[in-house]
């Protein structure tokens, strides 16, 4: 039986949910409070100079792969154009109702009553079988509670409201916090400000946005199927050594900004166990003295003077808080403080599959769109009755196991409570969906085997089989992508694996069975 489903938000996750649910024939209505699709990428919502920190291959949906023949980091405008093509190709926009804000979603028996408010203020109610929340993380800006901040007389904004660096021309500016957008914003402001200070509580792990495949281990450590499994099976004590191998070539570099990056990476701890900022743009202005970092945090404010925990102080005219966002679902009665309290970070066990949260998982590597797409594929199967959620007890058991795993794996940055390992999470969801790719033998399909094991874990591999497969086009994409690993390494691995299997077969137990 086909369901009537309400989707809240037409951002990257909402678009994925529309596509996967309509693939199963469900009737979908997506309410978007803005006048256009794209969420944070909507026109006028973010600064124009934005470039993605995730490559085109991990920001594109598996059923509409990039047309470029090489790795690229799309600009905001380029990504919006990709989304436009996606919506047009699958006729998705007919399901979106713009300028309509969901003000309340309430469960009544086995139905949901959704109240929406139009741009003119008119309110209407509709009934649905399911509600899918795709409103995203970026709803309620978070700012720290700092002593004396209320007495500061200068300008205070959150990165959510940043549009143009010229607003800070000639001013003494302090940026607080570091993420991908903060690296861009701080760098831009430093070009025009009289002084630009960057306040951080601790040294962050920062990886380059642009990199050569063969030269930078950040590309393969956790995005390759093979290396992900090898690295994550090692004891945590080995991970610092792996990180050292990454930064040692930078700390000895003649290039000052590379040397600074290496020093920060060294001081931040194993990058495998924390959120990583994938944007090194900041290190050039730091090396040039345009950005002055203060590591340790803010003690208090006295008027327009900021006093840091290391005892130093600075006079400033403006503050830009790049300090993230709070979870916010004002239209729901359910209170959610941490997404790790949900089954697969999607479902509230006590509510079941009629309420889903899509796109609230943050992969340490890889992009949110492909994860939201995988979540939506599972949701679509649940809606169609092809799959069903585990028992309440089993869901709670999985929630606890997953939470313990992610808290241990990313213990250096516990405040990023939605962080997951891309490869592990995608595989776990693929098993639920039934689209986990089977690695072929060397005899059956040697080229595909090499690409699956040794190249990044592209979303296309989850279209080789399972519901709504695109076997031929997915295989073509995978086998035509250049090798990340070298052929000598690949051959060495395959020989070692074959030897291991041979030795296992020739074990004493097997020999005894053969003698019988």
Curated annotation (Swiss-Prot):
GO MF term list: flavin adenine dinucleotide binding; N,N-dimethylaniline monooxygenase activity; NADP binding
Catalytic EC class: oxidoreductase
Residues where FAD binds: 13, 32, 40-41, 51, 102, 365
Gene3D superfamilies: FAD/NAD(P)-binding domain
Record key words, sorted: FAD, Flavoprotein, NADP, Oxidoreductase
Superkingdom of the source species: Bacteria
EC number(s) reported in the record: 1.14.19.55
InterPro entries hit by this protein: FAD/NAD-bd_sf, Flavin_mOase, Flavin_mOase-like, FMO-like
Annotated Pfam families: FMO-like (PF00743)
Cofactor: FAD
Catalytic activity: 2 bromide + 4-hydroxybenzoate + 2 NADPH + 2 O2 + 5 H(+) = 2,4-dibromophenol + CO2 + 2 NADP(+) + 4 H2O; bromide + 4-hydroxybenzoate + NADPH + O2 + 2 H(+) = 3-bromo-4-hydroxybenzoate + NADP(+) + 2 H2O; 3-bromo-4-hydroxybenzoate + bromide + NADPH + O2 + 3 H(+) = 2,4-dibromophenol + CO2 + NADP(+) + 2 H2O; 3,4-dihydroxybenzoate + 2 bromide + 2 NADPH + 2 O2 + 5 H(+) = 3,5-dibromobenzene-1,2-diol + CO2 + 2 NADP(+) + 4 H2O
Role this protein plays: Brominase involved in the biosynthesis of polybrominated aromatic organic compounds. Catalyzes the bromination of 4-hydroxybenzoate (4-HBA) to 3-bromo-4-hydroxybenzoate, followed by bromination and decarboxylation of 3-bromo-4-hydroxybenzoate to 2,4-dibromophenol. Can also use 3,4-dihydroxybenzoate, with lower efficiency, forming 3-bromo-4,5-dihydroxybenzoate and 3,5-dibromobenzene-1,2-diol.
Protein family according to the UniProt entry: Belongs to the FMO family.
Listed PANTHER family: DIMETHYLANILINE MONOOXYGENASE
Protein name: 4-hydroxybenzoate brominase (decarboxylating)
Gene: bmp5
């Amino acid at each position: 039986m086909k369901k009537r489903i309400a989707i809240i938000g037409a951002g990257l996750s909402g678009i994925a949910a529309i596509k996967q649910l309509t693939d199963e024939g469900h009737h979908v209505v997506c309410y978007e409070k803005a006048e256009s699709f794209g969420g944070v990428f909507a026109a006028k919502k973010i600064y124009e100079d934005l470039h993605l920190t995730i490559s085109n291959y991990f920001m594109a949906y598996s059923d509409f792969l990039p047309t470029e023949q090489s790795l690229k980091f799309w600009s905001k405008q380029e990504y919006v154009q990709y989304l436009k093509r996606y919506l047009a190709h699958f006729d998705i926009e007919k399901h979106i109702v713009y300028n309509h804000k969901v003000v309340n979603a309430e469960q009544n028996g086995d139905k949901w009553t959704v109240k929406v408010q139009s741009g003119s203020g008119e309110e209407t109610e509709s009934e649905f079988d399911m509600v899918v929340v795709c409103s995203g993380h970026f709803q309620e800006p978070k700012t720290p509670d700092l002593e004396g901040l209320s007495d500061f007389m200068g300008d205070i904004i959150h990165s959510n409201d940043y549009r143009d660096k010229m607003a800070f021309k000639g001013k003494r500016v302090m940026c607080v916090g570091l993420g991908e957008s903060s690296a861009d914003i701080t760098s831009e402001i430093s070009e025009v400000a009289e002084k630009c200070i960057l306040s951080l509580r601790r040294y962050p792990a920062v990886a380059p946005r642009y990199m050569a495949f063969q030269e930078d281990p950040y590309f393969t450590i956790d995005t390759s199927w093979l290396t992900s499994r090898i690295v994550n099976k090692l004891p945590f004590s080995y991970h610092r050594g792996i990180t050292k191998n990454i930064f040692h070539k930078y700390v000895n570099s003649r290039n000052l900004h590379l040397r600074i990056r290496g020093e920060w990476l060294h001081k931040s701890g194993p990058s495998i166990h924390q959120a990583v900022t994938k944007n090194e743009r900041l290190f050039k202005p730091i090396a040039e003295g345009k950005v002055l970092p203060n590591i340790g945090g803010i003690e208090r404010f006295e008027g327009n003077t900021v006093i840091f925990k290391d005892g130093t102080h600075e006079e400033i005219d403006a503050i830009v808080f790049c300090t993230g966002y709070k979870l916010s679902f004002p239209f729901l009665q359910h209170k959610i403080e941490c997404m790790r309290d949900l089954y697969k970070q999607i479902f509230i066990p006590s509510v079941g599959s009629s309420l889903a949260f899509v796109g609230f998982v943050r992969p340490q590597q890889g992009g949110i769109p492909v994860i939201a797409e995988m979540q939506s594929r599972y949701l679509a199967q649940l809606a169609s009755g092809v799959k069903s959620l585990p028992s309440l007890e089993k869901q709670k058991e999985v929630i606890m196991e997953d939470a313990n795993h992610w808290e241990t794996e990313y213990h250096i940055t516990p405040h990023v409570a939605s962080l997951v390992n891309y490869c592990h999470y995608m595989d776990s969801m693929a098993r639920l969906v039934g689209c986990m790719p089977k690695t072929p033998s060397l005899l059956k399909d040697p080229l595909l085997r090499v690409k699956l094991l040794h190249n990044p874990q592209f979303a296309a591999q989850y279209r080789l089989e399972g519901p709504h497969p695109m076997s031929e086009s997915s295989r073509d994409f995978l086998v035509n992508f250049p090798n990340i690993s070298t052929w000598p390494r690949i051959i060495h691995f395959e020989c070692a694996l074959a030897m291991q299997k041979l030795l296992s077969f020739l074990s004493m137990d097997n020999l005894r069975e053969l003698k019988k």
